[in-house]
Amino acid sequence: MRLTNIRTIALVAAAGVAASMTAVRAADVKVDLSKETVGKAPVVFEPMMGMWVVAQDGPDKVIKVDGQAFKAALDTPTRLALENARKMYGTSNEELMDNAKQFTTFPIAVLKTVDNFSNGTISVKFKTISGDADRCSGILFNVKPNGDWLVVRYNDTEHNVVLWEFHNGVRRPLIRPRDGDLLTGPDDRAKWHDLKLTVDGANLQVDLDGTTQLKYVLGSDPAPGRNGAPPNADLIPANNPVIRPPVSGKVGLWSKTDSTSLFKDYVVSPKQ
């Protein structure tokens, strides 16, 4: 075989590998806040619940969830959630209307530029500012039109990372550290910390500041309840679509009650 033919074959093979890699890895979606207006609600996110505004942190524009302001204005959260849900999904949804009454204690903001996330990574930097009842910062994902969702969050008061599911108006933990395994976690609230979710089919992994904290397989059978009692029926995958693979839904930011946190560098890296 001639050398030129060998080179041609090698180039074709390399091109095929490159094309394959391109097909597997889609373009990253990096949230750019540079054109957002400080003091206003973010344009790139749809605040479904809670008080979300653009703030200034040194040289950077950031997203701020103001838990104190939200706590003081809990008279209209359901109406706000329904109005914003109609913007995203186009129609009224009776299931969402029922669920909206239940998730008023969880401020959430949905990213507008990602219609559906199934595989890949989602990462964000967060800084905890304050909170009397809670100090939570999280990545929202698998958001369904009926208001069901999954979230991975760091709680600055418990010093742990937990994966939660929200279904039929009720939030339950899918996996959390055991009492004897509570993490030390980052105590320095003046610094930014990195939270990263990796989704590979049914496999979920959560990293905090570069250290893996949780691994979970969607569709897994739940552990028995306390004292060997049967598990909650909603934690059985056959009864609960949001905990069955594959992941498929919108993504965003999550908080809880009176938590006040800052977020920046939100990046979605899809993988097909």
Predicted features along the sequence, with ranges:
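Sec/Tat signal peptide C-region and signal peptidase I cleavage site
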Residues: 22-26
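Secretory/extracellular carbohydrate-interaction modules
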Residues: 70-169
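Beta-strand-rich interaction surfaces with strong enrichment in secreted/lumenal proteins
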Residues: 98, 107-115, 179-187, 240-241, ...
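Bacterial N-terminal signal peptides that target proteins for export
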Residues: 1-13, 17-20
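Short tryptophan-centered beta-strand motifs in secreted/extracellular beta-sheet-rich domains
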Residues: 33, 122-124, 187-208
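Extracellular glycan-recognition surfaces and repeat-rich motifs
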Residues: 40-92
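Short, aromatic/His-centered strand-loop micro-motif at the edge of beta-sheets
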Residues: 169-196
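Flexible glycan-contacting loops in extracellular carbohydrate-active proteins
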Residues: 216-264
